[in-house]
Amino acid sequence: MIVTTTPNIDGRKIQNYYGIVTGEAIMGANVVRDIFAGITDIIGGRSGAYEEKLQDARQIALKEMEQNAARMGANAVVGVDIDYEVVGQSGSMLMVSASGTAVTVV
């Protein structure tokens, strides 16, 4: 599955458009609370544990989006956008969402 932020793929022609596909991942209250409380390992102003959790959530969201595209018959997703949003009561959760357009390229 080809996944790209661009609206097209160089050297490939979009044959079919299937519509918008999405994927989401939500990090629970304990992870977000720990991250913002500074309990994680901060090295040089960056939190390695936080970055790892964000990477995990991003990969889950992208994988879910790809699976949804494959179910539609697509072999690529173009125009991908990844968003991060704090949700829940008092910002207790972090949601990572990925969205794009499912297409078939040849």
Curated annotation (Swiss-Prot):
This is UPF0145 protein DSY2697. Transmembrane segments: none annotated. Belongs to the UPF0145 family. Signal peptide: none annotated. The lineage of its organism: Bacteria, Bacillati, Bacillota, Clostridia, Eubacteriales. Pfam families: YbjQ_1 (PF01906). InterPro entries: UPF0145_dom_sf (IPR035439), UPF0145_YbjQ-like (IPR002765).
